[in-house]
């Protein structure tokens, strides 16, 4: 996919719960969605956002993925990691998947996205991760579900997707939002119109970002094919025709960035080292197909 606009796309930021997208694309191919899981008390008592798990064998893997991607359950993230053989194994596999996607800015330290020293991602990498997820029917189904029934010890209750644009923005597919006091607001999402998909990523946003996401998507659909791309999303390593060289964090400056809407213009200089002083980083990749996400060749290729 072509990158239509970007600010500090490889800057390192805390991903918060957007990292759950990486958890999902790592585990969806591995876990039987009908398998019944009994979460540990430790998983059920994880801090932060939770779906409300109890240590009883009443949940399927499918239930846990809904809880992970719809309501950002940190308890569900840990329960899925347990079902996969444990935290250490799951984190190692998440980082392997990131390397395969050439998401070299990303280091996962938790399956939930809760802040940990050294955990990081970038707007560019979250776009790579979202693209990989959208190619998975299961992932696409989970992130686009508005409301679902969730098991309880006696019966069930309803959970509703945290994506405020789902069902309100034309063509919105979904993906994942996140927030912590250190990461601030983050979002990676996708919308499809007339067979074309736009992915938008915002990181370290200080406030309400939903209107800005809608503005960015509007702009992306309006200018697609009319502006010179500033880069392109690299393919996964398995799709590259020859072995990739040792990864480097290349971020060539585009000679002329395309015009962007006011919502896409960051008010402060980007700081690539930690992201602490940059209030926003985003990338707007475009693709030619809703599933394959293939775009035109970019004028400036971001090589790693």
Language-model regions, residue ranges each:
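Active-site-adjacent loops and short helices of periplasmic peptidoglycan-processing enzymes
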Residues: 2-124, 128-137
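Domain-terminus/edge residues, biased toward the C-terminal soluble/receptor-binding domains
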Residues: 104, 111, 115-304
